[in-house]
From Swiss-Prot:
Protein species of origin: Bacillus cytotoxicus (strain DSM 22905 / CIP 110041 / 391-98 / NVH 391-98)
Pathway: Protein biosynthesis; polypeptide chain elongation
GO cellular component terms, A-Z: cytoplasm
Protein name per its UniProtKB record: Elongation factor P
Transferase as UniProt keyword: no
Domain of life: Bacteria
GO biological-process terms attached to the record: peptide biosynthetic process
Gene (name only): efp
Chief location: cytoplasm
A Pfam family assignment: EFP_N
Length: 185
């Protein structure tokens, strides 16, 4: 059990027999009445986001999530195959389970698979990934007013806004949390 006063971003808890990850939280001490913790939680099974308020000092069950380092091997129809590098055990995840992460996954990429009591919850990506530009408009010389961007399609199908000087074939560093361009690789 953990007190809601000890909440931190990324903490995984069990509330109403469901797994939730704390996205945001705020301790509120009103001038009148008891203190409370206002939180925004993401359901790890469905992806739904819910705002929930807890009384200060209230206890919730902490969920012990296991993270396994795995390698993304390939897509086979609707299934995506991952392999544990230590045991060579392979697991398949459906497109629905990793819909958001698919935009960043490349073959042979190392990721962390989150599991809870043997149930696969999802894929945790690295903070940044390197992806190749497969399609973008050529930059026009002299068209540099200020922070000019253009759309670029990357090798995974993800479309991001990039500076005008980026060309096809270049490797870019992309932030996986926001899906935005960071720099050239």
């Amino acid at each position: 059990m953990i007190s809601v006063n000890d909440f931190r971003t990324g903490l995984t808890i069990t509330v109403d027999n469901d797994l939730w990850q704390v996205i945001e939280f705020q301790h509120v001490k009103p001038g009148k009445g008891a203190a409370f913790v206002r939180s925004k939680l993401r359901n790890l099974r469905t992806g739904a986001i819910q705002e929930k308020t807890f009384r200060a000092g209230e206890k919730v069950e902490k969920a012990h999530i296991e993270n396994r380092r795995m390698q993304y091997l390939y897509a086979s129809g609707e299934a995506h195959v991952f392999m544990d590098n230590g045991t060579y055990e392979q697991i398949e995840l459906s497109e629905a389970q990793i819909e958001r992460e698919l935009k960043f996954l490349k073959e042979n990429m190392e990721v962390s698979i989150m599991t809870y009591q043997g149930e696969v919850l999802g894929v945790e990506l690295p903070n940044t990934v390197e992806l190749k530009v497969v399609e973008t408009e050529p930059g026009i010389k002299g068209d540099t007013a200020s922070n000019v961007t253009k759309p670029a399609t990357l090798e995974t199908g993800l479309v991001v806004q990039v500076p005008i000087f980026i060309n096809e074939g270049e490797m870019l560093v992309i932030n996986t949390a926001e899906g935005k361009y960071v720099s050239r690789a």
